[in-house]
A protein has these predicted regions:
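Extended beta-strand/beta-hairpin segments
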Residues: 1-69, 82-218
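Alpha-helical metal-binding/catalytic segments enriched in His/Glu/Asp
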Residues: 75-76
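Conserved phosphate/anionic-ligand binding catalytic regions in large, soluble enzymes, centered on
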Residues: 79
Length: 218
């Protein structure tokens, strides 16, 4: 987004590494639009998402979890390259193939739906001079350092601040965020201007094959 300052989306205070602020607007069905601003770099990205036929969606864009999977494997790649530079390991070739599996049971309409996630499958193709034992330790240490791994290793309590039509609502059983209510983004989404067009950032290649997993469907 070229005019993030103009439309008013500001990044939160950067406490550790990076902090992001996300504005999300819901459309019909499962379609959503989001603006995400990074405190570290100041960049603002526009995302759209949808769901496929498994949730009666139109499959007009990636599902939200696809962005998580993409960010996860990108984080692993960054950590591997950073550790290689730190330890003086020359990597001549590196390719990561990651499969994420998510489960779903029950009905959203009946409020009985329960979602879950299976273990991630990460395949690493690498050409370097480390022997097998040293390479395994190197890759484990690199992927372990990913911020995503920190989120997945334990249970994290989220903090909430709720409002409706500008009036604050109680969070009930959820933990409350200590801070003021942020203003409604209103129609600022429509005023977002894209940067110079860049083709090929994402392209659709087809539906993900369904895989039977324990406890639900992928």
């Amino acid at each position: 987004v070229a005019n993030a300052d103009e439309i008013g989306i500001e990044a939160p205070k950067n406490r550790i590494g990076d902090a992001v602020r996300t504005w999300v607007r819901s459309f019909s069905g499962f379609q959503k639009k989001a603006l995400v601003r990074s405190a570290k770099k100041g960049d603002t990205w526009r995302f759209v998402s949808d769901e496929g036929p498994y949730l009666n969606g139109h499959d007009a864009a990636c599902c939200p979890l696809a962005f998580l999977s993409c960010g996860m494997v990108t984080s692993y790649m960054s950590e591997i390259m950073a550790l290689a530079e730190q330890q003086g390991v020359e990597i001549r070739k590196l390719k990561l193939i990651q499969d994420n599996y998510y489960t779903m049971q029950g009905s959203m309409m009946k409020r009985t739906m329960v979602g879950g996630a299976e273990n991630i499958e990460l395949q690493v193709e690498i050409d370097c001079d480390l022997d097998d034992m040293a390479l395994n330790e190197f890759l484990v240490n690199a992927t372990y350092a990913s911020p995503l791994n920190g989120l997945m290793r334990g249970q994290v309590e989220s903090l909430f601040k709720l409002s409706k039509n500008g009036a604050e609502l109680p969070t009930a059983g959820a933990l409350e965020l200590d801070g003021a209510i942020l203003p409604d983004p209103s129609d600022y989404f429509a005023n977002a201007v894209p940067m110079a067009a860049v083709d090929g950032l994402m392209s659709k290649v087809g539906p993900t094959p369904k895989k039977e997993v324990s406890g639900g469907t992928a």
